[in-house]
Amino acid sequence: MQGTTIAAIATPPGAGGIAVVRLSGAECYAVAARVFRPANPAKKVEQAKGYTALFGYFVDKEEAFDEGVALFFRAPHSYTGEDVVELSCHGGSAVARRLVEACLTAGAQPAAPGEYTRRAFLNGKLGLTQAEAVMDLIAADGRQGAALANAALGGALAKKINAQKAQLTALQAHLAAWVDFPEEDVPELDPAHLRTVLGAVREELDGLIRSYDAGAVLREGVDGAIVGRPNAGKSTLLNLLAGFDRAIVTPVAGTTRDVVEQAVQLGDIRLNLFDTAGLRETEDAIEAEGIRRSWKKLEEAGLILAVFDGSEPPSREDLALAQRCAGRPAIALVNKEDKPTRFDAELIAPYFAMVLPVCCREEGSRKVIAAAVARLLGTGSIDPHAASLSGQRQLSAALRARDAVAGALDAAAGGFGLDAVSVCVDDALDALCDLTGENASEAVIEQVFERFCVGK
C-alpha cells in the first residue's frame, strides 16, 4: 500500500558529515525529480531502479544549493514497504532544512513522529514488537542493550510468542471440537497431554517475565543512590565511576549538601547516579535538608551503593543505614581498603546482597563494582541474543497470558471441565495476540509510535 508522500530529516540535528532526508510514498520519485538533478544528464530519477544510487545536485527553484547522493528503493523492497528515496546532503541544519523545504514545495507532506516505522508496520514489513525494538535500538547505550533490541528487531520475541500461540491454537482446536460437537465422536483430550502442553507454555512465559527486569536495566538504565556517612568516600566513588572529577572532594565533613547527579556507563549498564549528602545528625538547616533528600533518593533508587569508612568501627549511623537497606537492591562498599581495617563488616552483612572491600581512589575497584552490579541486577547472566520483553505493554500482555494458562491448568486439575479450560486458553491466545500486535487497537498503535522521533 502506497500512502501520501512524506518527507523528513532522518539524521540527528546539527553539524555532521552528511544529513539524510527520507521520502516515502506513491509520489516520492516525482518529488525527488523536482529537487535532485543527476550529474549525468542521461540518468532520470523517475527511471531509477531499486537499490541504486545517483550522484547529483540538490536544487530549489532551479538553483543548485548542494551536491550529494540519492538512494532509490522500489516498493515493496524498502523499509516502509513503499517507494522510498533517501537524499544524502552535506551535514548541517541549514542545508538539510532547505532540502526538506524544497521537498515540501515539490509536493511532499511533513512526516509525523514515527510515521516511517508506522508505515512499515501497517504494510507488514515489521510486527509491533519489531517496531518497538527499533526505538529500543536507537535509545540503547550499551552493547548488550543494543543486542537485545537487535534480537527483537530480528523477530526473536515474535518467533517465541508465535511458537506458544501455535501450541495453544492446536490445543484449542481439539478442545473446541470436543466441547462444541459432542455428537461427532471427537476423542477426549488426554489429561496428561493437556497438562504437558499448558505447563510448557507457562514455563516459556515465566522465563520471559523473569528476564524482564534485567532486560529493562540494559535497555533503560537504572537510578542509583550513593549513600553513607560524611567522609566515607561517596563523592570519591562518584568520581571513580564517572571517570572524572564530577563532585567536590575535601577532608571537610559535610562538603556535599545537595544531591549531585551524573549519568555513568558501568559496563553495559547505564546508571543515573545520585551522590547524596552525608547521613548524620545535624542542627544545620541546609545540611538537614540535604540529608532528607538523601533518604528520599535511597527509597526511590533501583540500586543502592552504600559506602562505609573501613578505617573506622561501624557507627550508629552506619547500622541505621544498613537496616534501611534491608530487602533492597543494595551493595555495601567498605571503602579505604588501602588503610588498616577497623570496620566489622559482619555487623552489616545481613542487610545487603553483597559486601565488597574497595578503595574508591583505585581504578581496579571500578571493575569490581561493575561486576557486582551486573550480578545483583541480573544482567551478567542474560543472553543478549535471546527473546526478551520490552516495555510495560509487552510485560502486561505476557502476564495476562501466563495467568490465563495457569487458570487453564487449575481448571483442569480442579475438574471444572474442558469448557472451562477452553475459556482460559482463549484468554491466553487473546493476550498473546495483543502482545504481537495482531489484536492491537488504534489507541495501542498510537501509544507505541508516539515515542518515536520525526524521521524514523
Region annotations inferred by a language model:
Residues 1-147, 151, 155, 331:
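A glycine-rich (often HGG/GG-containing) alpha/beta subdomain
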Residues 2-13, 143-265, 282-284, 313-456:
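C-terminal-of-GTPase-core extension/linker across diverse P-loop GTPases
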Residues 55-65, 70-74, 254-282, 300:
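Switch I (G2) and immediately adjacent beta-strands of P-loop GTPase domains
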Residues 242, 277-278, 302, 309, ...:
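Short glycine-/small-residue-rich Rossmann-like dinucleotide-binding loops
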Residues 271, 303, 331:
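Short, Asp-centered acidic motifs that coordinate Mg2+ and/or phosphate
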Residues 273, 307, 333:
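Generic enzyme active-site microenvironment
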Residues 287-311:
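Inter-motif core of Ras-like GTPase G domains
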